[in-house]
């Protein structure tokens, strides 16, 4: 097969704006106008329209007289297949023998001292939202480099040895969930449930796949903590 054919058949990855629109439509209980969507995710209205048209072509959104209504199951499937978190550099790996919630609280305190936004994802955040097992690792998204040693963590060689994975992102949309999902659970900031779900698959393992199934059900039946 030629390189051009491979390129045409490859799955095109979403940019940050498209991923943010998808998360917003999954979270929303009702239709949203194009203007409201553009404003909420921080893109231009023409760009929002372009994204919505693409989603409509893939049966992931329906246009109604009141706005656009997301087909949430289809949006989740597309999110898993097409999104990738945009990182400034490679993720870094850290380890501590402290309980995972204690590690997260220490890292959050460090982030607060450095005025650095932070939000937690799998394993810890899904366990706080829809308990499933004893979490062994968590991903922390930050928007600047943090000296994790100051939170009592030591460098680990890789994912298999880590209790905490730090991802430095320049995508502010990854650092807070779409409304009306709650942005904080048990005193810890969490990423959007869609990203938590994606990260469970990214971390891998049969038990995480089961946890992802439970989280998906909780997303779809709206049983996760909400601000309203």
Task: Give the residues covered by each predicted segment.
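Short amphipathic alpha-helical interface segments
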Residues: 16-30
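Short, cationic-aromatic polyanion-contact patches
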Residues: 9-18, 33, 66-85
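Key DNA-contact positions within bacterial/archaeal DNA-binding proteins
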Residues: 44-46
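Hydrophobic alpha-helical interaction segments
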Residues: 147-228
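A short, conserved structural fragment
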Residues: 56-66
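Short acidic, hydrophobic short linear motifs in intrinsically disordered regions
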Residues: 30-40
């Amino acid at each position: 097969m030629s390189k051009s054919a491979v390129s045409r058949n490859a799955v095109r990855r979403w940019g940050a704006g498209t991923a943010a629109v998808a998360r917003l439509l999954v979270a929303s209980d009702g239709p949203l106008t194009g203007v409201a969507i553009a404003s909420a995710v921080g893109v231009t209205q023409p760009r929002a329209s372009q994204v919505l048209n693409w989603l409509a072509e893939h049966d992931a959104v329906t246009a109604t007289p009141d706005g656009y209504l997301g087909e949430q199951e289809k949006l989740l499937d597309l999110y898993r297949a097409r999104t990738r978190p945009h990182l400034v550099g490679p993720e870094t790996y850290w380890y501590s023998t402290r309980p995972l919630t204690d590690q997260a609280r220490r890292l959050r305190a460090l982030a607060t001292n450095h005025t650095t936004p932070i939000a937690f994802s799998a394993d810890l955040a899904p366990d706080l939202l829809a308990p499933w097992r004893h979490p062994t690792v968590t991903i922390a998204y930050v928007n600047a480099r943090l000296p994790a040693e100051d939170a009592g963590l030591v460098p680990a060689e890789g994912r298999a040895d880590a209790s905490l994975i730090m991802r430095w992102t320049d995508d502010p949309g990854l650092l807070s969930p779409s409304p009306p999902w709650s942005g904080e659970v048990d005193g810890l900031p969490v990423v959007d449930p869609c990203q938590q779900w994606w990260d469970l698959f990214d971390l891998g393992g049969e038990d995480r796949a089961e946890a992802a199934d439970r989280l998906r059900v909780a997303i779809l039946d709206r049983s996760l903590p909400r601000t309203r």
